Amino acid sequence: MVNMSKINKEIVIFIVFLTLVALWGLFVKTPVEDTKTPYPESKVGGMAIQFKDGISESEVKAILQHYNMTRNYRLTYDTNYSDMDYYIMADKDNWSDIRSELVTEMKGNNKKNWTLSIPAQVMKKEDYYVLPVSEQAVKDGKFLEILAKYDIKVEKFTWCKIRFLYSDGPRTYWIPEEDAIKIKNEMEQNENIFSVQLSYLFP
């Protein structure tokens, strides 16, 4: 004679087992192979470096030797890379007053072309503020009058370009974006360099 209590016990155990299997299937995800196309590595073919006014080619070369470019490069000194040619520098003690006078004059006499952008792009370099200005500004008597009041002169950026090379030959090459950003950040700590712009290569 079949023992019904034993059968019922086995059925209960089986149901519990199925329940545990079902729960395991809900909470454990089967690994799925990632079939997405990997994002291509960004390539930097060169840099445009914004040096201070009056720096010589030999000084530029000496400065660049302090940085690990990871690859050979070709230097072009004092290029016409950008429309951002002129700038003024004001120390932190006078900057607020100078900025106020320039803004007041620009608004009052519709001379918004004194700066290259609205709002104006301002860079901080140690204890100085660097304001790029337009060619129209450096020819404007009122603008020069304000500068003279604070004994400030108009200066000109020295733009230099470097192009990475393949081995020692003339063929254009590149470095990874990660390396380029590291070099850029290191360069922008130099007192003679205002900014570094990366030149990307696109497929």
From Swiss-Prot:
<dbReference type="InterPro" id="IPR008887">
    <property type="entry name" value="UPF0228"/>
</dbReference>
<comment type="similarity">
    <text>Belongs to the UPF0228 family.</text>
</comment>
<protein>
    <recommendedName>
        <fullName>UPF0228 protein MA_1589</fullName>
    </recommendedName>
</protein>
<dbReference type="Pfam" id="PF05727">
    <property type="entry name" value="UPF0228"/>
</dbReference>
